[in-house]
Each structure stands twice: as structure tokens, then as C-alpha cells.
Amino acid sequence: MATYIRLTDYKDSDSKEQGFFKSENRYEAKQEDFEKIPGSPIAYWAKEAIKKSFENNLLGSIIPVKKGMDTGNNDLFLKLWTEVNFNIIGIGLVNGQDTITQCKKWIPYNKGGEFQKWYGNKEYIINWANDGEELKQSTANLRSQHLYFKNAITWNALTSNTTSARFSDYGALFDSAGSSMFPSNLYNFYLSFMNTKIVDSLLKIINPTLNYGAGTVGNLPIIFPKQESVKQQIDTLTQECIEISKEDWDSRETSWDFTASPLLIENGKLRIENGKIEDAYNAYCEYWKEKFY
């Protein structure tokens, strides 16, 4: 048995000194307890229930959880979707052959990005002309090619605080910084699981460096609800979160599905009558306040 003092939440030396003498910052743990967690991290602050949770199936043993590609030259192979002719971007393609038959050069590319739950961060595209001919002839590390273009759940592998996962259903390829999982069903369940506070806590135990790559996420323990009513409720609520997040994302001009300024939209329809900007703005604020809160 060893005693540990956790001071990571204190910002400066003076507050750390004060925290050093507080009993709530002291923990006792056995070395063998660390071995219950994949990678044996020195997670002395983990409660017994958390350590016991790792006796369940790990996520990576149930579904593919994969690290994406490294192009070797992002400046050459990647663009923001707004930088190229939209007509040669292939959105929703099924496989690489579609880039040839439909004359598409650029494909959506999941690359992590800012904190964004449920849906969004659809900013980057990758040169996959002729089924990735140029990239395949380069020094790029093209991992897990059999999973390209498939529906996925992707997340920010690198984060400064809290991870966020999103549903990807637009025929994307994926980056090492936008690692992804590929369930064959139950997409909403896995997505909701990834966006829970408990997963955020588990990730910080498995890998305190906040680098949540495929290996780290694949070691998450997971339990499936037994009651069908609970499964249905999770599915319904998650789908609602996806739709709200998608509507929010598409309300910006940075989305390729943008149609009109949200100030011109009321209850999902284009405003017909002329009105004051102030009234439109207030209606906009009320609409999204109701959606999110």
C-alpha cells in the first residue's frame, strides 16, 4: 500500500502547497490495483467501482476501433472544402471506385477539430482522385483502407480537456487525429456512450496525457442495457441530439449543406414577411435556447 497526493487541479505553487495538507487530496492504492486497468496506469485516484468496470468487455474487442491515415504531406493532399470547386467533391460516395465513375477528386476527411458533439466538424477534404492513386504512390501511411467511406463514429484524438464524438455518414476517410470506430449497428448507442461523462473520466484514467487515440478508446469497458425500453430511449434521445447538432452545424456558411442565414429561418421555414432584424435575432435566440436548454 502506498500513499499518493493529487495536486493536478491546483494552478500554482501556493495553492498546491495548501492542497498538500488537505485530506481529500490523499489516496491509498496497491500496485496490483493498477494492473486491473489496461496499460497499468498509476491511477491511484480511481474508485473501486471504476477499477471493477474493466472486468467487462472492452470496446475494441466488440467493434473495430481504428487509427486513421497519415498523409505525410497534409499541405499537398488536404484542403478545406471551401477551397475547391464543389462539383468535384464527392459527398456520400460508397467506395473509391465512385471517384472514377462520378469524376470526383476530393472526399470528406475526418480530422478531429474543435470540441463538437454529435455531428459536425465537416471541414476538410482529401485528394482521392482515381481511388487515391496519388496518395497510394506516395509515402502516406494508409491504415485500415477497408473501412474508408463507411459510416463511423469519430472523435478528437487530441484534446485539451473533454473529448467529443460525432456521427459520420457522408462517405469520409479519416485521419490519425480523427480516429474512428465502425459498429455494424447500434450507432446511436455507441455515440451516446462516447459522449458521456463517465467515458470522459475513464479516458483520463487510461491515458492521463489526454491523447485519446484508437488504442486508448479501444480499452474502454462497456456495458449494454438489458431493458429494451432503455435501449429505445437512448436511441431516441441520441437521434434527437444528432439532428439538433446537424441543424446547428448546417446553419453556418462553413457547412456544405448551408442554405440560408438562420435569421431568415423561422420554425424550419424561410421567413416570408418583411420584419426587423432585431425581431429575427430574438426569434433566433429563443429557437436555439429551446433546442439546447
Predicted regions and their residues:
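Sequence-specific dsDNA recognition surfaces
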Residues: 117-144
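Structured secondary-structure scaffolds
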Residues: 103-106
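Signature of N6-adenine DNA methyltransferases within the class I
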Residues: 1-96, 121, 135-139, 150, ...
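Short, charged/polar surface micro-motifs in flexible loops or helix N-caps
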Residues: 131-134, 158-162, 186-187
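Conserved catalytic core of Hanks-type protein kinase domains
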Residues: 193
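Non-catalytic DNA-recognition/assembly elements of restriction-modification systems
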Residues: 41-44, 53-62, 221-293
